[in-house]
């Protein structure tokens, strides 16, 4: 190979290296822009304020909190911009309970002046005596039982100061 051929080969190789480097740079810039654009569109349940374990179910986000009283659960959910799930939708309760693997958990029903409410909405709660006995409770609820838990496809009256599993809910964003 003569000297001119060797110089031409060097220039061609240098040109190819510059071409590849510029293509890689352009490609990486394109990936970065795409990633930033998609990140703004992706809706994440994610970790909120240090609270991990959020799960997306039917376009909503849920997380489980173990060993908590009813009042503690309300405060905990509020702190994380969430609420106790709407228990008026039984299909929601069944899906969330099975996905999170929760057997019993707090429901958002409370007793005031001998009537049951979901917030300010009156609801009809009839606890299941058989399920109460399964939990070692008397068939009839005690007057101090002013909260409810969901247990084995039923609702049971419970003392608000007892500790159970709780579930927090937040819309998917």
UniProtKB/Swiss-Prot annotation:
InterPro entries: C-type_lectin-like/link_sf, CTDL_fold. Residues 50-169 form the C-type lectin domain. The keyword Hydrolase does not apply. Disulfide bonds: none annotated. Coiled coil: none annotated. GO terms for molecular function: carbohydrate binding. SUPFAM superfamilies: C-type lectin-like. Keywords: Lectin. The keyword Transmembrane does not apply. This is Putative C-type lectin protein FPV198. It comes from Fowlpox virus (strain NVSL) (FPV).
């Amino acid at each position: 190979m003569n000297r001119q051929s060797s110089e031409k080969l060097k220039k061609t190789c240098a040109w190819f290296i510059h071409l590849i480097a510029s293509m890689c740079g352009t490609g990486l810039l394109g990936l970065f822009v795409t990633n930033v654009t998609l990140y703004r569109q992706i809706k994440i349940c994610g970790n909120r304020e240090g609270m991990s374990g959020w799960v997306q179910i039917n376009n909503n986000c849920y997380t489980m909190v173990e060993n908590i009283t009813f009042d503690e659960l309300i405060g905990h959910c509020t702190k994380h911009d969430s609420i106790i799930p709407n228990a008026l939708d039984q299909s929601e309760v069944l899906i969330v309970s099975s996905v999170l693997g929760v057997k019993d958990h707090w429901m958002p029903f409370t007793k005031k002046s001998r009537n049951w409410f979901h917030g300010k909405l009156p609801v009809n709660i009839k606890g299941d005596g058989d399920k109460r006995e399964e939990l070692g409770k008397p068939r009839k609820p005690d007057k101090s039982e002013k909260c409810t838990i969901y247990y084995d496809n039923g609702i049971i009256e419970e003392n608000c100061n007892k500790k159970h599993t709780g579930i927090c809910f937040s819309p998917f964003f």
